[in-house]
């Protein structure tokens, strides 16, 4: 956990906390509700110490997490349930409900479906993100100086800091996978927009390629789409020279940003 949190903070990403494996606290360690509550306090305290130690000073106070603020969720990813405190208290008065479900289920995992139906883990994660994670415009206003090595006062630097969809198009490919012999790059659009058929310079590779097949992720599927604007995640199929960690800029860029324009290797 420390390694992951430190990576996030180094890249000026706000971390949120999901306390996983609650089932083990109940079934293996046989903790009661009060002991589980104390364990939560310890985990949250240790998490906040990491923020104090590694977060930039201007973010430290606002990025610390608390159960009462719904910046912490808890549950069991294995059994598919999770909740923030407010989500839990909307349906149950105490944690004894969860403990009773596990006691009644024994080794019969199908009886745990009641928790999955009552508190779907994806709802908890989505609520935490929607309520607490910054939107792309706000995030890029302070993140870009930490993750991009180009000049901030250039046209490109200004577009990146404001997530300007009308600025030069700049992307970062965080993941590249191969499916059925075809590469699929997952990229964040930091400025500008990408339209099917646009040509890009892959900065590290020094190659130009066209994005002839783009889409957005819908769960496990990729929905083909003609264009995507800054602040979004795009899937690009078929790039031959793309690798994870590549920075991409529209090949016709002729602005005033000079020198090294690639993003730092984002963890």
Protein language model regions, located:
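Structural and coupling elements of P-loop NTPases
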Residues: 1-267
């Amino acid at each position: 956990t420390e390694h992951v949190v430190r990576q996030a903070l180094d890249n000026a990403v706000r971390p949120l906390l999901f306390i996983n494996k609650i089932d083990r606290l109940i079934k293996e360690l046989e903790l009661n509700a009060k002991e589980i509550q104390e364990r939560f306090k310890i985990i949250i305290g240790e998490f906040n110490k990491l923020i104090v130690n590694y977060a930039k000073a201007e973010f430290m106070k606002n990025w610390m997490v608390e159960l009462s603020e719904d910046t912490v969720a808890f549950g069991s990813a294995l059994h598919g349930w999770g909740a923030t405190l407010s989500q839990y208290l909307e349906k149950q008065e105490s944690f004894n409900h969860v403990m009773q479900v596990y006691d009644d289920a024994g080794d019969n995992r199908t009886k745990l479906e009641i928790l999955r139906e009552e508190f779907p883990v994806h709802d908890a994660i989505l609520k935490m993100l929607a309520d607490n994670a910054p939107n792309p415009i706000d995030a890029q206003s302070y993140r870009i100086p930490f993750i991009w090595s180009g000049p901030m006062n250039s046209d490109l630097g200004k577009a990146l800091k404001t997530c300007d969809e009308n600025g030069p198009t700049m992307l970062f490919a965080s993941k590249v996978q191969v499916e059925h012999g075809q590469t699929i790059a997952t990229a964040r659009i930091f400025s500008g927009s990408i339209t099917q058929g646009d040509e890009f310079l892959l900065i590290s590779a020094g190659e130009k390629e066209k994005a002839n097949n783009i889409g957005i992720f819908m769960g496990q599927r990729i929905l083909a789409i003609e264009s995507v604007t800054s602040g979004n995640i795009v899937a690009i199929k078929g790039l031959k020279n793309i690798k994870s960690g590549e920075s991409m800029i529209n090949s016709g860029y002729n602005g005033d940003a000079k020198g090294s324009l690639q993003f730092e290797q984002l963890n």
